[in-house]
């Protein structure tokens, strides 16, 4: 699955995207609000990157550590809350009820699966460990966004501190 879209104020490129992927096996989701989608994606990905850095890329070290995995969720929720409170949409729409129990259970299951199988290496640690500069910049930009919008993000900050030497 690939999510593609446009930034605010840009002309729609939905038809072009459909033409490009026509006849392929890709499932394409067109998102007309990529700015908010990418903000939300970053708020979900960064806590997972913190976990990768805490474990030097071996997420299996967190297998069974439900307390830590719940902190990842708490940081994600802090990020989503800051994004929502700044007037942005929570995307994908399935995440809109991010403070609900269903969201928490679904994400916790996903994080547990990532830490118990090679899915974590494939979905998170390979990228995080090979894109430290990118993750560092993303983290800096998100913290700047949080600060500019008066958001509290103590769990995020604690996880960041535990990430150790990786983030610059």
Model-derived features with residue positions:
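Internal alpha-helical scaffold of NAD(P)-dependent oxidoreductase catalytic cores
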Residues: 1-91
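NAD(P)-dependent Rossmann-like dehydrogenase/reductase catalytic/cofactor-binding core
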Residues: 73, 77-168
């Amino acid at each position: 699955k690939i999510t593609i879209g446009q930034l605010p104020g840009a002309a729609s490129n939905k038809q072009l995207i459909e033409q490009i992927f026509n006849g392929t096996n890709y499932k394409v989701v067109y998102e007309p609000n990529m700015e908010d989608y990418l903000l939300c994606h970053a708020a979900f990905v960064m806590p997972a990157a913190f976990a990768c850095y805490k474990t030097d890329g071996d997420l299996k070290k967190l297998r069974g550590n439900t307390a830590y995995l719940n902190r990842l969720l708490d940081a994600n929720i802090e990020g989503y809350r800051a994004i929502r409170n700044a007037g942005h949409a929570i995307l994908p729409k399935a995440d809109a009820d991010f403070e609900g129990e269903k969201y928490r259970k679904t994400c916790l299951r996903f994080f547990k699966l990532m830490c118990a199988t090679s899915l974590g290496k494939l979905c998170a640690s390979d990228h995080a460990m090979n894109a430290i500069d990118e993750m560092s910049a993303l983290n800096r930009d998100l913290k700047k966004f949080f600060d500019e919008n008066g958001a509290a993000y103590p769990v995020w900050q604690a996880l960041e501190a535990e990430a150790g030497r990786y983030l610059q």
